[in-house]
């Protein structure tokens, strides 16, 4: 029907697929989002996440690494430097717990006309989401209920296990789709110290890819060895024993043009109080 006005239908189809631009509430403070003032280490980390690159926060449990990462992600979304968030964790259980926290976080920063709920991506995600979703149209063939395994990372916001992102750098079907879904997003990789050598090697490749895709990579860990830190940053780092520790490298040296030495920066907080 060439005479038909397809514009409203196209917008509806794109909206149904979850690809409409985000509508954020701007100017929200850390206190408004989380109900308390940021600690010194949290504020220092938030201040340093200024654009695409790799940012590592090493701090003990209970220091609020998750809140710091989420607020840094909010700042990137607010400034138009990111198009979404993927929060990667080592297990299905931790993914389920963080999914609830990210869901509450998004309900505060997004306007009503934006996609509100983050997808949960892991092998048994349906066990958690089945009771939360009204099936409706999503249960029809071709709708997200059947496609989430292939295109889950295309959603603006998702929480899941690290393997969902690792498949972007492994020779598997739809790896290019997964890489495309991560491009330009804030990718938060939590509990990085918990991965074995095999998984850690693939994570190194993933971080390299994410830098090339102009992602903002936030790595959270209790502690990292010097060699692991250097592998993520792609730059030699002097030995430091300070703790907590914030390490960062931006993506400027990865842009096309004459090759330049990658610049890295460190911020040290000498007290955990």
Model regions and ranges:
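N-terminal helicase ATP-binding lobe
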Residues: 1-273
